[in-house]
Amino acid sequence: MQVRVLDTTLRDGEQTPGVSLTPEEKLRIALKIDALGADIIEAGSAITSEGEREGIRKITSEGLRAEICSFARAVREDIDAAISCDVDSVHLVVPTSDLHLEHKLRKTREEVLEQAVDCTEYAVDHGILVELSAEDSTRSDMDFLRTIFREGIEAGAERICACDTVGILTPERSYEFYRGLSELGAPLSVHCHNDFGLAVANSLAGLRAGASEVHATINGIGERAGNAALEEVVVALKSLYDVDTSINIEMLYETSRMVARMTGVYLQPNKAIVGENAFAHESGIHADGVLKKAETYEPITPEMVGHGRGFVMGKHIGTHALRKRLDELGMKVADDKLMEIFRRVKTLGDMGKCVTDVDLQAIAEDVLGVMEDKVVDLQEVTIVSGNRVTPTASVKLRVDDREVLEAGTGVGPVDAAIVAIKKSLEDFADITLEEYHVDAITGGTDALIDVVIKLRHGDRIISARSTQPDIIMASVEAFLSGVNRLLANEKSEGTH
């Protein structure tokens, strides 16, 4: 048995409060989800807006492997909009509960049934595959639900879907519910929401009951409490039930990160499968056990989903354990560099920060990149900034054994500091900042900040970076690190 996967990140997922994707962003996510292996991509709802249609058209024009689908109500206008986007199929959604019929549509069961049949026939006549979906099906009369599906199948629907729209199923009820719909003569899909935190469990129960397709979103994003998380469903199917999907499981982590970054909906650290702590272990018994045999505390390997294993360190770390971990990370350091890394790790630990492998690598790379002989050395930096104060910085540098004091203003404290440094160096070198990139490499307001910059001096461009808990100091140190590399190169070439 192989379960089909309909990814609805671009439709149901985009209904997450605060998420709005541009056509270009939707295309980038669709390309990634297609590479991931989803069978069907619900690209959006074509009737929504011209921008939405533009996004769907961009996706359909790519000739992707996946079937491209548009959400549609049982209204011909919705289907026409989908047809204009050249989609392969429509996810034709019809409310079926009396609650929805009375208070939302203000229609009778007979009227809704007629609409469902008419729009199914209309879409099929225009060469569009129909997946007929019952909204709020889990609060619907089962006889009416079966009637809608039977009539829809006779009208040409190739697949049917029963939506647990407000997430009220339990795994036991989910099994019984989908079992009761599995013999209607068309492939059945499960579509579960996460209002009680049961979307994944209910989806798995529905698939066990006879459904052959699951609707899910990357990271479980969606309105209210979200949808079934695609990564959790497919890994559970593979690992716990030995059921295959078309998903390339090794791409799950990178896909999750991309979607989180582009939607701005970041993951809780302990999110199953793709969270930063999903394979992280504190020092002690667990870490020791995992180092000896990973299966002692890991049900699946991080490599299976494209993730990595992490060991968290803090203020109790010793130099021996630190060196061992650096060796395991492939980083050979001299004793003096080790002590500087050790000092920084201890400092972060005293601030209440746990240091992960990502932190440690960033700190070590920063320390190993520090040159012994600096042309420019920072003596002092002072920043003044506020809502009624122009950001101002003063810096004291030692440049070739000369002390230089300068001040600068900018649009923010980082800009002011860089302006002051550039003014300090005007008599020594013409340095241009080409690129500036900042990233919080760990979560929280006390996150480590990784600053990467590109500097130009003449025809030479170099990159430099610094990692600090303080964005201003990280930016200043990255800038000066780059300046020192440029000027040191000139010295070695005899041009300075």
From Swiss-Prot:
Report the InterPro entries cross-referenced here: 2-isopropylmalate_synth_dimer, AIPM/Hcit_synth_CS, Aldolase_TIM, Citramalate_synthase_CimA, LEU1_arch, LeuA/HCS_post-cat, LeuA_allosteric_dom_sf, PYR_CT
Keyword Ribonucleoprotein among record annotations: no
Q: Which reaction does it catalyse?
A: pyruvate + acetyl-CoA + H2O = (3R)-citramalate + CoA + H(+)
Q: Which residues form the Pyruvate carboxyltransferase domain?
A: 3-253
Q: Which GO terms describe its molecular function?
A: (R)-citramalate synthase activity; 2-isopropylmalate synthase activity
CDD domains from the UniProt entry: DRE_TIM_IPMS
Pfam families in the record, alphabetically? Answer: HCS_D2, HMGL-like, LeuA_dimer
Q: Please tell me whether the keyword Transferase is annotated for this protein.
A: yes
Q: Which domain of life is it from?
A: Archaea
Q: Which HAMAP family does the protein's record reference?
A: CimA
Please give the function described in this protein's UniProt entry: Catalyzes the condensation of pyruvate and acetyl-coenzyme A to form (R)-citramalate.
What name does UniProt use for this protein? Answer: Putative (R)-citramalate synthase CimA
